[in-house]
């Protein structure tokens, strides 16, 4: 299965009638493995800051999580495993796997819990596969 299939079929799929606004699978080095058509153009420094927060939990809290020029307020996640961010009625979930970052961006009417479930379910599966 291609990485694009994971994005299309597992991240951008419909959940309770809702779906993510955008999603991607990105290597720890910032290389894009696969992404939805409308995933924001991000800067390498934004991915580096996300990776730093996984190594040093809490480092993003003072500045916020930035992706594609959008700033998200960092909310409670799972140190070293999941970073969650909020911006207005939407937000972002980033799950770290052995080799990649699974990123889901949502907006209302999708809920934070639905986004977390979609992103973390795929992330947990990939971790189990050694990826």
From Swiss-Prot:
Protein task: Binds to actin and affects the structure of the cytoskeleton. At high concentrations, profilin prevents the polymerization of actin, whereas it enhances it at low concentrations. By binding to PIP2, it inhibits the formation of IP3 and DG.
Intracellular or extracellular location(s): Cytoplasm, Cytoskeleton
The protein, known as: Profilin
Gene3D superfamilies: Dynein light chain 2a, cytoplasmic
Known partners and oligomeric status: Occurs in many kinds of cells as a complex with monomeric actin in a 1:1 ratio.
PANTHER family from the UniProt entry: PROFILIN, PROFILIN LP04
One GO molecular-function entry: actin monomer binding
A Pfam family per the record: Profilin
Alphabetical list of InterPro entries matching this protein: PFN, PFN_euk, PFN_sf, Profilin_CS
Assigned protein family: Belongs to the profilin family.
Any one annotated GO CC term: cell cortex
Keyword Cytoplasm attached: yes
SUPFAM superfamilies assigned: Profilin (actin-binding protein) (SSF55770)
Domain of life: Eukaryota
Chief place of localization: cytoplasm
Record keywords: Actin-binding, Allergen, Cytoplasm, Cytoskeleton
């Amino acid at each position: 299965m291609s990485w694009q299939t994971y994005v299309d079929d597992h991240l951008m799929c419909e959940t309770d009638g809702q779906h993510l606004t955008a999603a991607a699978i990105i290597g720890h080095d910032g290389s894009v493995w696969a992404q939805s058509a409308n995933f924001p153009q991000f800067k390498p420094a934004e991915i580096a800051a996300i990776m730093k927060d996984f190594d040093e939990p809490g480092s993003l809290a003072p500045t916020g999580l930035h992706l594609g020029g959008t700033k998200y307020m960092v909310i409670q996640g799972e140190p070293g495993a999941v970073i969650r961010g909020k911006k207005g009625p939407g937000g972002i979930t980033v799950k770290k796997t052995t080799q990649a970052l699974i990123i889901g961006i949502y907006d209302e009417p999708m809920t934070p819990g639905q986004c977390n479930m979609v992103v973390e379910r795929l992330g947990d599966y990939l971790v189990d596969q050694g990826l």
